[in-house]
């Protein structure tokens, strides 16, 4: 059984949802990035969603764009990212690890080479933010060849046809968008998601994780009560890094507290 399936089964048995933080690999430096990831795991993260920094992050709001710039300026190349991913996998053999990134990085490496590198580093899933599902075939074929789950986005305004495609072609989990637009804790999660979750369930989709604008424990609880298998929080996590760049101890302390609070909200009584 794969890591995502094991995680969702384990959590369902305890009446819990998953809480998944996102950070950019190498932010603010590769060394501190490892300490941050260790803190996320130690504080209760159920899985990790990690970004490979890219110079033109289209779907990201200002917080994650700033993280990308910090990571690039500290010398975080794709090679460094894969070295860190290999270390993370060795430390946390059961933790699901997903990448959230842009197609240019995949094309630069070569699609086949990229997915092989992911498999070698122990990555479980890849979400390519700027590849719509109807253009995803060559990525899906390579992902399948190397045992990597292709993750697809279910947007809030999706037609039933789109949700059917997402359900049939995706693996691992389904990234459920709470609203359209760019990422960011600056803009809160939007529409009720119950109808989307019901439609995905009808099509036997991989479990849905709600993302975009998730910054408070109440939102995690609401997502799970509406039928999502959990929630992903990116900008709110990265904002804590940004706000504590001059004090790494405070950064790790604040990150730990945030993760503990968000994870506590995923436990339904």
From Swiss-Prot:
UniProt-annotated catalytic positions? 49 (proton acceptor), 60 (proton acceptor)
Output the InterPro entries linked to this UniProt entry: Aldolase_TIM (IPR013785), RibuloseP-bd_barrel (IPR011060), Trp_synthase_alpha_AS (IPR018204), Trp_synthase_suA (IPR002028)
Q: Which domain of life is it from?
A: Bacteria
In Pfam terms, one family for this protein is: Trp_syntA
- Per the UniProt entry, the Enzyme Commission number(s) are 4.2.1.20
The pathway where this protein functions is: Amino-acid biosynthesis; L-tryptophan biosynthesis; L-tryptophan from chorismate: step 5/5
Q: Give a yes or no for keyword Lyase in this entry.
A: yes
**Key word Lyase present:** yes
- Kindly state which keywords UniProt assigns to this record, in alphabetical order: Amino-acid biosynthesis, Aromatic amino acid biosynthesis, Lyase, Tryptophan biosynthesis
What Gene Ontology terms describe where this protein resides (cellular component)? cytosol
PROSITE patterns named among the record's database cross-references: TRP_SYNTHASE_ALPHA
| Enzymatic reactions | (1S,2R)-1-C-(indol-3-yl)glycerol 3-phosphate + L-serine = D-glyceraldehyde 3-phosphate + L-tryptophan + H2O
Q: What class of enzyme is it?
A: lyase
* Single GO term (MF): tryptophan synthase activity
The UniProt entry's sequence similarity note says: Belongs to the TrpA family.
Protein function: The alpha subunit is responsible for the aldol cleavage of indoleglycerol phosphate to indole and glyceraldehyde 3-phosphate.
Q: How does it assemble?
A: Tetramer of two alpha and two beta chains.
**Name recorded for this polypeptide:** Tryptophan synthase alpha chain
The gene name on file is trpA
């Amino acid at each position: 059984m794969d890591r995502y399936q094991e995680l969702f089964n384990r959590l369902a048995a305890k009446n819990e949802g998953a809480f998944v933080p996102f950070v950019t690999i190498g932010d603010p430096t590769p060394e501190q990035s490892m300490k941050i990831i260790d803190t996320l795991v130690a504080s209760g993260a159920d899985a990790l969603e990690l970004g490979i920094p890219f110079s033109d992050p289209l779907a990201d709001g200002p917080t994650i764009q700033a993280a990308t710039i910090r990571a690039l300026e500290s010398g975080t190349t794709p090679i460094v990212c894969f070295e860190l991913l290999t270390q993370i996998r060795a430390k946390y053999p059961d933790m699901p690890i997903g990448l959230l990134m842009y197609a240019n990085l995949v094309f630069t490496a070569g699609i086949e080479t990229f997915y092989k590198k992911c498999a070698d580093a122990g990555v479980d899933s890849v979400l390519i933010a700027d590849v719509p599902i109807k253009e995803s075939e060559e990525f899906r074929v390579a992902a399948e060849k190397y045992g990597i789950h292709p993750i697809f986005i279910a947007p809030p305004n999706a037609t039933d046809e789109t949700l059917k495609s997402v359900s049939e072609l995706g693996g691992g989990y389904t990234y459920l968008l709470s609203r359209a637009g760019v990422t960011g804790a600056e803009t809160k999660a939007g529409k009720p998601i119950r109808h989307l979750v019901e439609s995905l369930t009808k099509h036997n989709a991989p479990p849905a994780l709600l993302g975009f604008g998730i910054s408070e424990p109440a939102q995690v609880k609401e997502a799970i009560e509406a039928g999502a298998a959990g929630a992903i929080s990116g900008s709110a996590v990265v904002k804590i890094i940004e706000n504590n760049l001059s004090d790494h101890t405070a950064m790790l302390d604040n990150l730990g507290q945030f993760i503990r609070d968000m994870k506590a909200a995923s436990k339904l009584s």
